[in-house]
Regions:
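Long, well-ordered amphipathic alpha-helical subdomains in the mid-to-C-terminal portions
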Residues: 171, 178, 188-230
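Catalytic cores of RNA-modifying enzymes
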Residues: 1-195, 221, 239, 243, ...
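Short linear loop/turn motifs
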Residues: 226-231, 237-244
Length: 263
């Protein structure tokens, strides 16, 4: 396994499908995350031209990409440490990439928080993709499902078998397409919502009342009236509430907390 745990996509047909999933004319710039050996870049660069930038953590791969694609803006950095607003200060951005398995969800959450996100086409381990797209009540439905679906519309582009990569990983992958929703445009509101949902799922085997009480460090006598005010049964499990339910419930808790501060 390479130093940075990369698995490189070698299926040219899949690279073409990913590269053409979005129309460059709809965006101010495209950002490829982790181009590696450049298999996907070969299809992206002719389409995006000067509008394409790439972020690569591996200095050796960075040098290789620079040599293979003269004129391409490539940033040798860990994507998770980049200040996206500063590095890409203008233009609606599309993010494309075969993400490292171990930090794919952190990268996704960072992308969804970008103020000028236009869309994203990203590769995940299939198990993670199932968690992202899981429906209410599904075994895979949890914090990640709500956090991502509250901020974006998601579509499955393709399932990708392990044999499409080098070295061959032990798991299959899936490519998802994300289009941002405007529900959590405010950064402070988004962080509060994500924190609220994380607390709700902190004890997913317990009732919503118990899980929120423990997660928020609030007495049940404070939590129960707020759950009921939102129109929900406190005995429900966290996985029984939909994304829209969580948006509604978190808003009620926000108003409840604001009311307490005003007293």
């Amino acid at each position: 396994m390479p130093k940075y745990s990369q698995v490189f996509l070698k299926d040219a047909g899949m690279c073409r499908d990913i590269a053409t999933a979005l129309g460059p004319e709809e965006f101010g710039l495209g950002v490829e995350i982790g181009p590696g050996r450049g298999a996907l870049t070969e299809f992206l660069y002719p389409l995006w031209g000067a509008k394409l930038a790439a972020v690569e953590i591996d200095p050796l791969m960075t040098a290789r990409i620079k040599e293979s694609f003269p004129g391409l803006r490539i940033i040798n950095s860990d994507f998770l440490t980049l200040d996206l607003e500063a590095v890409f200060p203008s233009g609606t951005a599309a993010f494309i990439g075969n993400l490292p398995y171990e930090c794919s969800t952190a990268i996704l959450i960072k992308i969804l928080a970008f103020s000028r996100l236009g869309a994203a086409v990203l590769m995940f381990q299939r198990e993670v993709a199932r968690k992202i797209t899981a429906a209410t009540g599904d075994p895979d439905y949890g914090y990640l499902s709500v956090a991502v679906q509250a901020q974006s519309e998601i579509a499955l582009l393709a399932d990708v078998p392990a044999a499409s990569f080098s070295p061959v990983p032990e798991v299959d992958s899936s490519v998802l397409v994300f289009k941002p929703r405007k529900t959590l445009a405010d950064a402070v509101l988004r962080e509060r919502f994500l924190g609220f949902v994380k607390n709700a799922f902190s004890h997913r085997r317990k009732t919503l009342l118990n899980s929120l009480s423990m997660g928020l460090n609030m007495d049940k006598t404070e939590v129960e009236p707020l759950i009921k005010a939102a129109g929900f049964d406190p005995r429900l499990r966290p996985q029984n509430l939909s994304v829209e339910d969580y948006l509604k419930l978190s808003a009620v808790f926000e108003r409840g907390a604001a009311g307490e501060k005003a007293l």
